Amino acid sequence: MPLLDSFTVDHTRMEAPAVRVAKTMQTPNKDTITVFDLRFCVPNQEILSERGIHTLEHLFAGFMRDHLNGNGVEIIDISPMGCRTGFYMSLIGAPDEARVGAAWQAAMSDVLTVQEQAKIPELNEYQCGTFSMHSLEEAHEIARNVLARGIGVNHNDELALPEEKLKSL
């Protein structure tokens, strides 16, 4: 099985909250697609709550589009990581980490403006696979934590696992 890009970086050295360019690729039509690792939690030390990450998934995707789309950027998808330490964001374009971090920070402020569970987008059995598994309070806690800690940058060259280490794992 091929080694995926996300498993070639040292998770013990990642900082959070932080933005990382996980992958950049070109389509046959020469469009740039960039995948960002939006790390909310320090791996193996913190984890996003089940209900909080689910509610954040519903809110974050729209708010990030409000703040990041335009000027050569269009978000394709934002999805939670299975390890529940962050989200992957795929987009057309190549914004720098500072622009992504500023949009992320603004989106977290937007999350805090949602005051009622009923205001969570697509919170119904027709549009959500587990519509009863939400917590606006936990999503607010996640947003407050990100805003309090600030958003940094994780660099691949600083996190790359040496070839010898990869072979030994």
Swiss-Prot record:
Transmembrane segments: none annotated. Its EC number is 4.4.1.21. Belongs to the LuxS family. Binds 1 Fe cation per subunit. InterPro entries: LuxS_sf, Metalloenz_LuxS/M16, S-ribosylhomocysteinase. This is S-ribosylhomocysteine lyase. Its cofactor is Fe cation. Involved in the synthesis of autoinducer 2 (AI-2) which is secreted by bacteria and is used to communicate both the cell density and the metabolic potential of the environment. The regulation of gene expression in response to changes in cell density is called quorum sensing. Catalyzes the transformation of S-ribosylhomocysteine (RHC) to homocysteine (HC) and 4,5-dihydroxy-2,3-pentadione (DPD). The gene is luxS. Coiled coil: none annotated.
